[in-house]
């Protein structure tokens, strides 16, 4: 089917490439979501991700900051960035999710990838373009959609190579258009909501430090009781729990994406003692850090 007469879409359509020898991975997911599947807390992963919204609007929470997004917006997420989508009640929201991973350490391509992926590391993670510029990107996505429907590409080196090269054309086009981004966050907050989102953003960038309710109260010139009450009201989380969840989510990421010692990860994620880290990790994850790492290795 066509959405807005210009975007090819089909429920539960996937484009998957898992080229293990060359460390190239793609996962295109055309599907719809509604409010019933909204995540409780933000998550993160070791690959790049693009959300292309095909519904009227939604919210994307990135490192504790909510971004209001509209149909045709692209949300670009670098590895290890904490985020979650918030879909609204009513009709399910169509969207395209693209996850991908490249071998970024190869000398012959590392500089090129660093440059072409720079939009994923910009301060503004949401991209909105004019109809003409947006159509340049949609044309490439439509080409990939049609190709995946007409070819038995999986496991065919030539077909997978075509998809890989076509998507790099998409990334380069996005890179060329990055300075024409017209997005501005039209999410409206009252003054206390704005302050609370500043606090949550601070937590995401300073979770490795010694932060607490008392510290944040002084940092943002808010009384502890007021901050505690309003933080829970705005985010749905107790402030101390939010800090611990942010630390544990980052610890989980490091456990499966690095070979660091568990004690080093605990320290880097802001825990004052290893026993405290173990206790909180078990409480949130339902397993020990060591078992969490082992299960991730077995599942690969």
Question: What spans do the regions from the language model cover?
Answer:
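Generic protein-terminus/edge-of-domain signal
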Residues: 1-74, 81, 89, 114-115, ...
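Regular secondary-structure segments
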Residues: 54, 138-152, 200, 204-207, ...
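Short hydrophobic/aromatic patch on the recognition helix
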Residues: 72, 226-231, 276-281
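Ligand-binding loop in jelly-roll beta-barrel domains
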Residues: 80-105, 110
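Aromatic/histidine-rich interaction motifs
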Residues: 112-142
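Short, Lys/Arg-enriched, Trp-marked, Pro/Gly-tolerant hinge/linker segments that flank
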Residues: 123-135, 151-201, 205, 209, ...
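Terminal helix-turn-helix DNA-binding modules in bacterial transcription factors
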Residues: 201, 205, 210-217, 222, ...
């Amino acid at each position: 089917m066509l959405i807005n007469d210009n975007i090819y879409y089909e429920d539960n359509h996937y484009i998957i490439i898992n080229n293990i020898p060359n460390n190239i991975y793609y996962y295109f997911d055309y599907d719809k979501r509604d409010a019933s599947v909204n995540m409780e807390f933000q998550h993160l992963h070791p690959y790049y991700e693009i959300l292309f919204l095909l519904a009227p609007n939604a919210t994307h929470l990135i490192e504790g900051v909510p971004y209001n997004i509209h149909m045709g917006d692209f949300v670009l997420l670098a590895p290890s960035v904490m985020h979650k989508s918030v879909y609204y009640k009513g009709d399910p929201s169509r969207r395209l999710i693209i996850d991908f991973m490249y071998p970024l350490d190869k000398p012959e391509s590392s500089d090129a990838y660093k440059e072409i992926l720079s939009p994923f590391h910009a301060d503004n993670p949401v991209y909105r373009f004019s109809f003409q510029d947006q159509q340049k990107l949609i044309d490439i996505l439509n080409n990939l959609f049609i190709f995946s429907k007409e070819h038995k590409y999986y496991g065919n080196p030539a077909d997978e190579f075509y998809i890989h090269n076509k998507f790099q054309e998409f990334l380069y086009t996005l890179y060329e258009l990055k300075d024409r981004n017209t997005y501005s966050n039209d999410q409206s907050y009252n003054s206390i909501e704005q302050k609370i989102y500043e606090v949550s953003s601070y937590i995401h960038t300073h979770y490795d430090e010694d932060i607490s309710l008392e510290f944040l109260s002084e940092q943002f010139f808010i009384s502890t009781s007021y901050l505690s009450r309003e933080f829970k009201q705005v985010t749905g989380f107790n402030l101390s729990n939010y800090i611990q969840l942010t630390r544990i989510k980052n610890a989980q990421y490091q456990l499966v994406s690095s070979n660091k010692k568990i004690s080093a990860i605990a320290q880097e994620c802001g825990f004052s003692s290893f026993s405290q880290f173990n206790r909180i990790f078990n409480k949130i994850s339902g397993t020990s850090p060591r078992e969490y790492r082992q299960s991730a290795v077995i599942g690969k």
